Amino acid sequence: MASQGTKRSYEQMETGGERQNATEIRASVGRMIGGIGRFYIQMCTELKLSDYEGRLIQNSITIERMVLSAFDERRNKYLEEHPSAGKDPKKTGGPIYRRIDGKWMRELILYDKEEIRRIWRQANNGEDATAGLTHIMIWHSNLNDATYQRTRALVRTGMDPRMCSLMQGSTLPRRSGAAGAAVKGVGTMVMELVRMIKRGINDRNFWRGENGRRTRIAYERMCNILKGKFQTAAQRAMMDQVRESRNPGNAEIEDLIFLARSALILRGSVAHKSCLPACVYGLAVASGHDFEREGYSLVGIDPFRLLQNSQVFSLIRPNENPAHKSQLVWMACHSAAFEDLRISGFIRGKRVVPRGQLSTRGVQIASNENMETMDSSTLELRSRYWAIRTRSGGNTNQQKASAGQISVQPTFSVQRNLPFERATIMAAFIGNTEGRTSDMRTEIIRMMESARPEDVSFQGRGVFELSDEKATSPIVPSFDMNNEGSYFFGDNAEEYDN
């Protein structure tokens, strides 16, 4: 783990706090979670949802999206300045599903954004509680990561679809703050930077004038965030070059894509947090759980414990497999879309299958889908064990440079080997080591070549029984060494389209 001297823990980022001790962090994260729960209960009352309807994940997502939209200042301002037909900039809404005469019915609701903001603030002791909003954004981002593929976005920015394991958080809004930046993968940051540089190439005024100065500050900040994710000196030095460039162009894009490829073996540190749907927090608050008093952590046992005793339902399309739908949501809840399936399956206590074998589409139901044939079923979100979420990227060898897998970004701090196809990855590095970053490139390639797939990551770390809340006796799983654990293997998921 990087030195904690200057870094705030990601619970602190998430709650916008300065440095606090563990108890204070647990309390402020608990306060944030409790606020989301209270807001959800109030919304269910407003909408007159039955207990069953309030536990429906699709209803939870609609309510979450409404509050995010109500607080999206920039978009609200834009909508007011550019009125479009049939869209009231002051209102927000979405589909709410109700059980009527044994059938699921869709009802489109509309609310004043002002009213939603009032309910949210009231649930959060009168504050704006931006941390809670970011938390909801990260849950949506984790759900997208598990559900959709970003092949098109990768190809558009000149990256390779096989780099999908670097794309965590690629659908997070820009306004998601420090907590959002912590969970973004290396590929996501590279993609944001490449898009920015391309705009600068096409638009002469992009870096000029007062606006250009702000753009430049944003560019350098993004470069620093990405630099902070890399764990080797050579990768960081290359990021300094990209950041200091007088006028960023194709050379910088090349460097960034080189760095993204290198991250397949020399992994970046990317935070993982278990962010659950609002209805889960609502259920717990309704049953009398005081999150602020008890304290809460996004990276420990708490989310597992919460999911052990919450019942959440989901709408199921006629030919979908409810077990597969459960797997999808379980992975989203634990931010495990890019984790090794062997690890996820071990923790969950059920076999976890690659996405290409899932008979399920996304959780959200499109407005043109036929409700007549919709059924609902219970999501199985419980686990056999729990494990600590990591942000190290799983490099062995004193956390410097070692093996990653072409398709894994570890979520859980659990001992495993990181199988990877060195040949596949190294093939991408033939030739181009000239230019001003040549010595860094050579150094990075040298480190990658000396990485061994059989090295063990997270040495001695294990999973814990759910009764072992203090994490005293780790159980270290043993895995078949050559079994590749990619979720994206044989992928046929839909593309993510806004």
Curated annotation (Swiss-Prot):
One of its GO terms (biological process) is viral penetration into host nucleus. The gene is NP. Belongs to the influenza viruses nucleoprotein family. The keyword Ribonucleoprotein applies. Encapsidates the negative strand viral RNA, protecting it from nucleases. The encapsidated genomic RNA is termed the ribonucleoprotein (RNP) and serves as template for transcription and replication. The RNP needs to be localized in the host nucleus to start an infectious cycle, but is too large to diffuse through the nuclear pore complex. NP comprises at least 2 nuclear localization signals that are responsible for the active RNP import into the nucleus through cellular importin alpha/beta pathway. Pfam families: Flu_NP. This is Nucleoprotein. Keywords: Capsid protein, Helical capsid protein, Host nucleus, Host-virus interaction, Ribonucleoprotein, RNA-binding, Viral nucleoprotein, Viral penetration into host nucleus, Virion, Virus entry into host cell. GO terms for molecular function: RNA binding; structural molecule activity. It is found in: Virion; Host nucleus. The lineage of its organism: Viruses, Riboviria, Orthornavirae, Negarnaviricota, Polyploviricotina. A motif (Unconventional nuclear localization signal) lies at residues 1-18. Its main location: virion. A motif (Bipartite nuclear localization signal) lies at residues 198-216. InterPro entries: Flu_NP (IPR002141). The keyword Ribonucleoprotein applies. Late in virus-infected cells, may be cleaved from a 56-kDa protein to a 53-kDa protein by a cellular caspase. This cleavage might be a marker for the onset of apoptosis in infected cells or have a specific function in virus host interaction. GO terms for cellular component: helical viral capsid; host cell; host cell nucleus; ribonucleoprotein complex; viral nucleocapsid. It comes from the Viruses.
